[in-house]
Amino acid sequence: MSTAQKAKILQLIDSCCQNAKSTQLKSLSFVIGAVNGTTKEAKRTYIQEQCEFLEKLRQQKIREGRINILSMDAGVSNFAFSKMQLLNNDPLPKVLDWQKINLEEKFFQNLKKLSLNPAETSELVFNLTEYLFESMPIPDMFTIERQRTRTMSSRHILDPILKVNILEQILFSNLENKMKYTNKIPNTSKLRYMVCSSDPHRMTSYWCIPREETPTSSKKLKSNKHSKDSRIKLVKKILSTSILEGNSTSSTKLVEFIGVWNNRIRNALTKKKSFKLCDILEIQDNSGVRKDDDLADSFLHCLSWMEWLKNYESITELLNSKTLVKTQFGQVFEFCENKVQKLKFLQNTYNND
Amino acid sequence: MSTAQKAKILQLIDSCCQNAKSTQLKSLSFVIGAVNGTTKEAKRTYIQEQCEFLEKLRQQKIREGRINILSMDAGVSNFAFSKMQLLNNDPLPKVLDWQKINLEEKFFQNLKKLSLNPAETSELVFNLTEYLFESMPIPDMFTIERQRTRTMSSRHILDPILKVNILEQILFSNLENKMKYTNKIPNTSKLRYMVCSSDPHRMTSYWCIPREETPTSSKKLKSNKHSKDSRIKLVKKILSTSILEGNSTSSTKLVEFIGVWNNRIRNALTKKKSFKLCDILEIQDNSGVRKDDDLADSFLHCLSWMEWLKNYESITELLNSKTLVKTQFGQVFEFCENKVQKLKFLQNTYNND
């Protein structure tokens, strides 16, 4: 990876931010998935941090001609992940894999419940880590949804939340260490991927831009249940649009489904209007609870990173163009503002359907 | 490791337990550090589980001529570990290493506090894992004190306890995975160690056998603070006895200190009667709080495993002897009862000093 190139582009972006208004910095942070800092200074620092990641992905995509991202939403009985690929000249990412697993069923054959005994968690998460490498291609980036450590109401943490935090942390560490130890093996192809936490808040705010808040709507909008349902609804819309709209340049089409996925979604659509995501994945969730939210979230995390990377690529192209620097900076913030409007348009279209 | 040999000895021990009284099974569980089951059936199962571990250690010791155990008490600012070695024909284990580390100081150069950001915990615990392999010999077993997941009074879990649970779990997993991945490297010497959780309750009850409970004493005895102080006091006694009693067969001598340790303990003893364990390790704990309890606990965990292994070896010798089976079984429980009495004598001697 060319460090000089990276330093140059990060420097260009920071110069672009130097004299920008706070609202401009906010929209730039939004379209690349950066934390939105409370001060201009903090906004610039967070923008640089996120660009650091995205620049690595951009250069890997140039090198390999494509980028593969696997995004996970960790849970013991509901572990969901989605894997997508973006080719160099394709406008839309393709869905390669999308699964929900009951970890106790898959790795303990339901013979035991996952206790907090470190020997058991170590064994289970090692097998899960190896499972994520079974299907090719190996991702260039693994993202794991960042778990909250607080129960909504109290400053304490409950057992199930402790368990999923431990699962998230060991998985993150295992993925990094597998690369460190495997790359010590001489004469073998080196593993080269990134592991990164994905913030559920930034994912949610990218896809559900709060409309002008009316007193009643904002309370309802913020309820956890409502936010989950709206994300599931959004993913179903993205799926149906992807199948029904053949032409991949239409603005409301965000992702491609290939092969088996195409038929499954078509079947689910034709069978009944209100299908479940679990139906598409043909999940016989014998635990009875056919939850869709983990599937929706893992899908949206993956799609967010693809969107943030594409937006970042557009920004770097503007900054590498031959036009005057001042014009470039103006074009960058214009691009960001347009992107925000497009997303609002998309959400309105989907909500009005 | 000869599986047949292992199966044979485990079978012999179970036959020995088959017709034993509950009190006999209790003393056998006690001297080998097994969980004390509530029923005879449960006692036998837990005895077998513990013997499985100890048999692996015993065979490794026969093969290598010695056994090295490294025991840890995890904490972010107070990470303590103790490493001991037991040679085949030596009656007492030797202390090879004994440290307390402030993890943020050592691995983050105090530049940042350990947040629960998985990227930071992964980086810190990887460096800690590698650090544990820096000094030779590589242990045959790593034990990590099992952390409680509950705050004493409430059914909830507080942040610091979440952090130390995550530290314990990632460390356990890292140690196991380092071996799995490293052993995939062709033509390199294989890593061969065990990783096991060490139960603080079993350690504490081995060294602080509750005297006949009087109403007042039992409440005081059970207070967490009192139990910690008595363990620190016990370790100081073990240290001073080890130095002052040259002859290693005296019943109150439990461990050998060699080289630099000898002088440090002697200096600490001569300087002032009430020395701190931190003084011996020359820890300038600039955090101001020179806590001794982590040092004491890591020491006692390690010494417990050495004691449980030695007791297990004595039991297997009795069961492998030429005498009548019935007599062997009687001798086993006699040995256990004597061991319990010796420990009570030791504690009384120490407490009366």
Swiss-Prot record, chains A, B:
Changing F79A: >200-fold decrease in activity. Pfam families: Ydc2-catalyt (PF09159). Changing Q147A: 70-fold decrease in activity. Transmembrane segments: none annotated. The keyword Hydrolase applies. One of its GO terms (cellular component) is mitochondrial inner membrane. It is found in: Mitochondrion. Its EC number is 3.1.21.10. It comes from the Eukaryota. Changing R231A: >200-fold decrease in activity. It catalyses: Endonucleolytic cleavage at a junction such as a reciprocal single-stranded crossover between two homologous DNA duplexes (Holliday junction). Signal peptide: none annotated. Its cofactor is Mg(2+). Changing K291 to A/R: >200-fold decrease in activity. SUPFAM superfamilies: Ribonuclease H-like. Changing D292N: 80-fold decrease in activity. One of its GO terms (molecular function) is flap-structured DNA binding. Keywords: Endonuclease, Hydrolase, Magnesium, Metal-binding, Mitochondrion, Nuclease, Transit peptide. Capable of resolving Holliday junctions. Specific for 4-way junctions. Seems to be important for the maintenance of mitochondrial DNA. Cleaves fixed junctions at the point of strand exchange. Cleaves after 5'-CT-3' sequence. This is Cruciform cutting endonuclease 1, mitochondrial. It comes from Saccharomyces cerevisiae (strain ATCC 204508 / S288c). The gene is CCE1.
